């Protein structure tokens, strides 16, 4: 799992960092819950489960996100892997974020995906994944009907 946030302005990089931290905490939490369901959470304790890249027009920060899992509590952290400037050293690091991200997808992601698949395959069959119905309609279908989009979609499908 990976996210990237790009911002501009005086505190842009910090805002991008916070948004990435939020997104990756949700993703890491989902992985932790999956591994808890199959009683294998020790496999991912303190392991990087997600990456994020935050940048503005000048600087880049690359983080790894992980969880410290105790019996009663899980705490989420991020680890700064690399921080650099695009323009420093005559642009020497201008491809660093790209190379890092490509390596994540080429090397790490396949192993991580296999680990997730094994956990999904080990889910107990008696788990109930049903979602309770919404108390109120979302308003999406009503909004589409009122704008005649449903009819347009139906016509384009035929």
Annotate the PLM regions.
Residues 1, 10-158:
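Extended catalytic cores and adjacent scaffolds of nucleotide/polyanion-binding enzymes
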Residues 7:
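Anionic group-transfer/hydrolysis microenvironments
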Residues 4:
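Conserved beta3 VAIK motif of the Hanks protein kinase fold
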């Amino acid at each position: 799992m990976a996210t990237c946030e790009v911002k501009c302005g005086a505190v842009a990089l910090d805002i991008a960092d916070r948004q990435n931290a939020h997104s990756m905490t949700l993703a890491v939490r989902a992985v932790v819950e999956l591994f808890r369901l199959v009683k294998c959470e020790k496999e991912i304790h303190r392991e990087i489960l997600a990456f994020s890249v935050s940048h503005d027009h000048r600087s880049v920060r690359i983080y790894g996100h992980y969880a410290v899992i105790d019996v009663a509590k899980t705490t989420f952290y991020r680890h700064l892997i690399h921080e650099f400037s695009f323009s420093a050293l005559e642009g020497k690091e201008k491809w660093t974020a790209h190379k890092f991200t490509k390596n994540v997808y080429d090397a790490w992601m396949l192993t991580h995906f296999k680990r997730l698949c094994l956990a999904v395959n080990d889910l107990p069959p008696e788990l109930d994944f049903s979602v309770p119905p919404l108390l109120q309609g979302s308003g999406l279908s009503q909004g589409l009907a009122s704008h005649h989009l449903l009819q347009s979609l139906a016509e384009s499908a035929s």
